[in-house]
Amino acid sequence: MDTKSFKRTLQQSDNYNRKGFGHKEEVMDAMTNEYQSDLIQEIRENNYRLQRGDVTIYLAQAFGFCWGVERAVAMAYETRQHFPQERIWITNEIIHNPSVNQRLRSMAVGFIPVENGQKDFTVVESGDVVILPAFGASVSEMQILNDKGCMIVDTTCPWVSKVWNSVEKHKKSDHTSIIHGKYNHEETIATSSFAGTYLIVLNLDQANYVANYILHGGDKNEFLEKFKNAHSQGFDPDRDLDYIGIANQTTMLKSETEEIGKLFEHTMLRKYGPIDFKDHFMSFNTICDATQERQDAIFELVKEPLSLMVVIGGYNSSNTTHLQEIAIERAIPSYHIDSAERILPGNRIEHKPLGDDLIITDNWLNEGKIVVGVTSGASTPDKVVEEVIEKIFAFKSSLVPG
């Protein structure tokens, strides 16, 4: 399918909007009241530090709502204001933050139901309004909604759209797209739908496996089993790795994405030589600025003498998980929570370790003076960060020494 042509036709339709409806000022006032925080602004103005009693907070210098997230949420608010009576749906969570998604539900925005792992679009009728979230939506979903005669409000982050353009270039030049991402993440599902032939690698270990296969060959059945949920239909590693281009899920760990890109560049250079390798390899520049800034900020934060780290964001948020990884790699006790409600009485905290289910840890705040590093994912409002910080102050001051 010519996805580029379909996208162009859709964007020229009267039933498509990606610029909002002219209610930006009113919407931003509402979002400021609901999501911004005077306390967080105070901490910013105090060199990203705040001390009360025995607790000193060190806040990362880049954290929380990114421009793409703020834009998506604002467009969703505008959509409800512009269509006060119409049925409004969204194809997925607008962003990976439970409080924001719950706010949309309170505004009577319906979430497309999922049955046996498949979205049930039969609930959508002609004339309904359907929001595409910040992660985007697959080509097939857009086709379904377009065929139904829906008003489509597209809040896809421009950085995600940039990746789509990259994989479409790969497809046009008959290159396989190697996508650094999570095959079941909404963004990567959407990106792969715009690609031709593709392979999704989760991490550097998987990338090294593929690079070794490119250079030395291997067991095709083993390869296909290893990547059974992460490649295009009919993918053949013996045929489809001669010409490759690199793309990424925008929320992956920047350093790993860059390392994977360099790995494949060196692999193709080694296999095809300096004259021909450029025909076989397409480089990329699709690392999201906001993701990079937040990761750079936590790399700086973990240099401080921290007692512990609190990382705030949705548990299904990829960019938040990678912030957690950075702290753990520095051997800093780190707690990933999605709201202040996870901080429990009795010096207990309910949190999500990397790759594991929620657990409760006792005595997580040490006695005496402590320095707490705080950061949050790109989908986390400042108001949520404020609530977490205030609860840390309150619970620490209530602890009885001894």
Swiss-Prot record:
It comes from the Bacteria. It catalyses: isopentenyl diphosphate + 2 oxidized [2Fe-2S]-[ferredoxin] + H2O = (2E)-4-hydroxy-3-methylbut-2-enyl diphosphate + 2 reduced [2Fe-2S]-[ferredoxin] + 2 H(+); dimethylallyl diphosphate + 2 oxidized [2Fe-2S]-[ferredoxin] + H2O = (2E)-4-hydroxy-3-methylbut-2-enyl diphosphate + 2 reduced [2Fe-2S]-[ferredoxin] + 2 H(+). (2E)-4-hydroxy-3-methylbut-2-enyl diphosphate binds at residues 96, 185, 250, 317-319, 379. Binds 1 [4Fe-4S] cluster per subunit. The active site is at residue 187. Its EC number is 1.17.7.4. Keywords: 4Fe-4S, Iron, Iron-sulfur, Isoprene biosynthesis, Metal-binding, Oxidoreductase. GO terms for molecular function: 4 iron, 4 sulfur cluster binding; 4-hydroxy-3-methylbut-2-enyl diphosphate reductase activity; metal ion binding. GO terms for biological process: dimethylallyl diphosphate biosynthetic process; isopentenyl diphosphate biosynthetic process, methylerythritol 4-phosphate pathway; terpenoid biosynthetic process. It holds the Pfam family LYTB. Catalyzes the conversion of 1-hydroxy-2-methyl-2-(E)-butenyl 4-diphosphate (HMBPP) into a mixture of isopentenyl diphosphate (IPP) and dimethylallyl diphosphate (DMAPP). Acts in the terminal step of the DOXP/MEP pathway for isoprenoid precursor biosynthesis. This is 4-hydroxy-3-methylbut-2-enyl diphosphate reductase. It comes from Microcystis aeruginosa (strain NIES-843 / IAM M-2473).
